C-alpha cells in the first residue's frame, strides 16, 4: 500500500488528483497542471516534497567519508550552510543517485536524496560509512515543502519571526540555515528562486495552511516535471541511472577531478570514459505542431555523413515557451539540427544546450 505524507489530507482538500509515485500517494495536479506551471513562473507555488529522504551524517571523519562517496568534492564546502549538487556513483561510474549535500559543521553534513532510490541509497551510504565511523540518521521526523517562484521568498518571509528573517537575510543560492524549527534552503527544482523548507512533521499542516493564506498556490508533480524540464534539470531514472555516466548526462561539471590524488568511488571508470568519450545530453526544440515524448528516437548525420540515432529521455510541451522541448541522449558529433520520428512522421528539431528557461525568461535559443 502506498505511503502518505503528512499533507495528504491537505492535498485532497485542495482538490488534488492523487497518484502513486514510487510508493507514495502524491498530487499530480490540483485541477490544471498548466496553470500551476505558470503560477510558479510568474508568482509563487508550493510543492509537497516530503517523500524525499533527508539523511544526517555525524562524525569526526564525515568530510573524509563524503570525499570518497561523492563525485563532487565537499572540500569546496568551507562556509557552514553551503551546499553542492553531486552524483553518488558505483564502481563502473554509473549514477546511483543525484543529491544535494549541506555542510553544517565539521562533524555534521546533511544529504537530501530521491524517493525512488531511498532503499538502495541508504544501504550504499551505511555500507560505506562504517569504516569511517560515521553515524547515519534518516530524518523521517521531518517534512519538506518547496516554495518556488519570483515572489516565493517574499511570501515565505511573512510567516517568519524577525529572528528567522534575520538568519536568512542575504542568503545566496545553495545555502541552508537552521532557523528555530525550520531548515530553510535556497535550493529548488524549477529554475526559479525560492526555498526548500524542512520542518517537524507535526508542524507542516499548519505551515502549509499559512502558505495558502499568504497567497501561495499548491502545485503538483505534473508542473514540477515541466518546470524542471524547462530549466534543463535531470530526473533520476530518465536522464541518468546506474548504467549512465554523469559525463553522458550533462553532469560533468559535478565531477571534481582535482586534486588528482582524491580517490572517489567510480573515479577510475570515469577517467577511462573521459579519455574514450561518451554520449552527450542535449536539448531539443520543435516549434512545429506536435509533442516530443520520452523514448522517441533522434536521428542525425555527423560531419562525415555517418548516420546516428539517439533517444529522448524527457520530452513535453513547454507552457512557458508555447512549443515542445526535450532532453535527449545522443552519440557525440551532433550538429544544430536533427530529426525525431513521431509515429510515421519525421519532424525537424533544433539542437541546443540543455536549459530552455531561466528565472521565468526564455534562454537565448
Swiss-Prot record:
Tell me which Pfam families the record gives. GCV_T (PF01571), GCV_T_C (PF08669)
Could you state one GO biological process linked to this protein?
glycine decarboxylation via glycine cleavage system
One GO cellular-component annotation of the UniProt record comes to: cytosol
Q: Which UniProt keywords apply?
A: Aminotransferase, Transferase
- Catalysed reactions, semicolon-separated: N(6)-[(R)-S(8)-aminomethyldihydrolipoyl]-L-lysyl-[protein] + (6S)-5,6,7,8-tetrahydrofolate = N(6)-[(R)-dihydrolipoyl]-L-lysyl-[protein] + (6R)-5,10-methylene-5,6,7,8-tetrahydrofolate + NH4(+)
- Gene3D superfamilies (UniProt xref): Aminomethyltransferase beta-barrel domains, Aminomethyltransferase fragment, Probable tRNA modification gtpase trme, domain 1
Annotated family: Belongs to the GcvT family.
What is the recorded function of this protein according to its Swiss-Prot or TrEMBL entry?
Answer: The glycine cleavage system catalyzes the degradation of glycine.
Descriptive protein name: Aminomethyltransferase
Amino acid at each position: 500500500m502506498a505511503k502518505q505524507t503528512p499533507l495528504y489530507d491537505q492535498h485532497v482538500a485542495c482538490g488534488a488528483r492523487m497518484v502513486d509515485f514510487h510508493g507514495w500517494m502524491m498530487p499530480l495536479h490540483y485541477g490544471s497542471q498548466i496553470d500551476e506551471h505558470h503560477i510558479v513562473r510568474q508568482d509563487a507555488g508550493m510543492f509537497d516534497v516530503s517523500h524525499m529522504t533527508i539523511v544526517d551524517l555525524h562524525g569526526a571523519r564525515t568530510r573524509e567519508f563524503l570525499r570518497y562517496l561523492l563525485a563532487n568534492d565537499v572540500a569546496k564546502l568551507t562556509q557552514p550552510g553551503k551546499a553542492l549538487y553531486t552524483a553518488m556513483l558505483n564502481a563502473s561510474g554509473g549514477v546511483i543517485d543525484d543529491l544535494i549535500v549541506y555542510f553544517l559543521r565539521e562533524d555534521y553534513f546533511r544529504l537530501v536524496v530521491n524517493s525512488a532510490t531511498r532503499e538502495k541509497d541508504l544501504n550504499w551510504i551505511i555500507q560505506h560509512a562504517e569504516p569511517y565511523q560515521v553515524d547515519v540518521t534518516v530524518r523521517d521526523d521531518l517534512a519538506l515543502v518547496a516554495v518556488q517562484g519570483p515572489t516565493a521568498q517574499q511570501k515565505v518571509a511573512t510567516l517568519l519571526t524577525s529572528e528567522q528573517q534575520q538568519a536568512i537575510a542575504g542568503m545566496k543560492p545553495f545555502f541552508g540555515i537552521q532557523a528555530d524549527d525550520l531548515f530553510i534552503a535556497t535550493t529548488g527544482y524549477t529554475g526559479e528562486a525560492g526555498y526548500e523548507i524542512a520542518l517537524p512533521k507535526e508542524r507542516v499542516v499548519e505551515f502549509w495552511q499559512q502558505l495558502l493564506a499568504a497567497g501561495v498556490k499548491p502545485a503538483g508533480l505534473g508542473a514540477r516535471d515541466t518546470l524542471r524540464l524547462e530549466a534543463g534539470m535531470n530526473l533520476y531514472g530518465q536522464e541518468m541511472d546506474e548504467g549512465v555516466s554523469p559525463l553522458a548526462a550533462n553532469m560533468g561539471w559535478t565531477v571534481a577531478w582535482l586534486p588528482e590524488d582524491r580517490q572517489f568511488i567510480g573515479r577510475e571508470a570515469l577517467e577511462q570514459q573521459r579519455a574514450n568519450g561518451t554520449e552527450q545530453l542535449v536539448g531539443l526544440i520543435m516549434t512545429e505542431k506536435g509533442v516530443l515524448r520520452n523514448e522517441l528516437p533522434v536521428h542525425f548525420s555527423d560531419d562525415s555523413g555517418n548516420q546516428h540515432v539517439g533517444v529522448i529521455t524527457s520530452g513535453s510541451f513547454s507552457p512557458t515557451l508555447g512549443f515542445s522541448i526535450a532532453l535527449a541522449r545522443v552519440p557525440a558529433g551532433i550538429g544544430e539540427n536533427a530529426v525525431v520520428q513521431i509515429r510515421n512522421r519525421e519532424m525537424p528539431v533544433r539542437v541546443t544546450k540543455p536549459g530552455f528557461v531561466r528565472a521565468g525568461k526564455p534562454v537565448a535559443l
